């Protein structure tokens, strides 16, 4: 039997693993490409993104632990709330490779819309199990709304650079 803190720490850290993998695409050429794009004046400074995502990932990870614990682990009852969570997390992790790697701003926007829908469904499913766990997702939902609008504006304002075009060397 693992120590009681192991599942709490493990499930809290899981979302950050994908965040670290996604960071691979948000560096070097991907970062130079993004810096060259037209962005609205209200886009967040780069230095804010790691603390924002670290907080959001930790909150959702801990929320998943609460749901997991309330439902007795990975049980049949946990299939929908934790399955939705896993689905939104996979869609979330897909965004950096789509946006920064493939430079497909329109597809990245579609991905964010899917993430937002599945994250909303996750929140509703978690609320039936644990309202406090669901509340841990509220800041994430707000950030997804902001990120979706930002992605739309960047896509709209850079329409000639949609198809994954690369900067000239």
From Swiss-Prot:
Topological domain ranges for the Cytoplasmic compartment: 27-46, 101-105, 156-169
UniProt keyword annotations, A-Z: Lipid transport, Membrane, Mitochondrion, Receptor, Transmembrane, Transmembrane helix, Transport
Effect of loss of the gene: No obvious phenotype. Mice are viable and fertile and present only very minor changes in gonadal and adrenal steroid hormone production. testis-specific gene disruption does not affect testosterone production, gametogenesis and male fertility.
Listed result of changing residue 153 to S: Abolishes cholesterol transport
Induction, as annotated: By dimethyl sulfoxide and diazepam.
Tissue expression from the record: Detected in liver (at protein level). Ubiquitous.
Primary location class: mitochondrion
Membrane topology, from the record: Multi-pass membrane protein
GO MF terms, alphabetically ordered: androgen binding; benzodiazepine receptor activity; transmembrane transporter binding
A Gene Ontology term for the protein's cellular component: mitochondrial outer membrane
Transmembrane segments: 6-26, 47-67, 80-100, 106-126, 135-155
Keyword Electron transport: no
GO biological-process terms attached to the record: adrenal gland development; behavioral response to pain; cellular hypotonic response; cellular response to lipopolysaccharide; cellular response to zinc ion; chloride transport; cholesterol homeostasis; contact inhibition
Highest taxon of source: Eukaryota
Residues in compartment: Mitochondrial intermembrane: 1-5, 68-79, 127-134
Protein location: Mitochondrion membrane; Membrane
The protein's assembly and partners: Interacts with TSPOAP1. Interacts with MOST-1. May interact with STAR.
Role of this protein: Can bind protoporphyrin IX and may play a role in the transport of porphyrins and heme. Was initially identified as peripheral-type benzodiazepine receptor; can also bind isoquinoline carboxamides. Promotes the transport of cholesterol across mitochondrial membranes and may play a role in lipid metabolism, but its precise physiological role is controversial. According to some reports, it is not required for steroid hormone biosynthesis.
Entry's family note: Belongs to the TspO/BZRP family.
Name by which UniProt lists this protein: Translocator protein
Organism: Mus musculus (Mouse)
Gene coding for it: Tspo
């Amino acid at each position: 039997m693992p120590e009681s803190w192991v599942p709490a720490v493990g499930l809290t850290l899981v979302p950050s693993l994908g965040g670290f993998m996604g960071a691979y695409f948000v560096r070097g050429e991907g970062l130079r490409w993004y810096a060259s794009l037209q962005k609205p004046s209200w886009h967040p400074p780069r230095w804010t993104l790691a603390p924002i995502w670290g907080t959001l990932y930790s909150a959702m990870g801990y929320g998943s632990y609460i749901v997991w614990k309330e439902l007795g682990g990975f049980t049949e009852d946990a299939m929908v709330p934790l399955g939705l969570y896993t689905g939104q997390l996979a869609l979330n992790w897909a965004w950096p490779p789509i946006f920064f790697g493939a430079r497909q701003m329109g597809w990245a926007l579609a991905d964010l819309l899917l993430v937002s829908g599945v994250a909303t469904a996750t929140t509703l499913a978690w609320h039936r199990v644990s309202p406090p766990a669901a509340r841990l997702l509220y800041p994430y939902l707000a950030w997804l709304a902001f990120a979706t609008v930002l992605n739309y504006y960047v896509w709209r304002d850079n329409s000639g650079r949609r198809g994954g075009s690369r900067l000239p060397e």
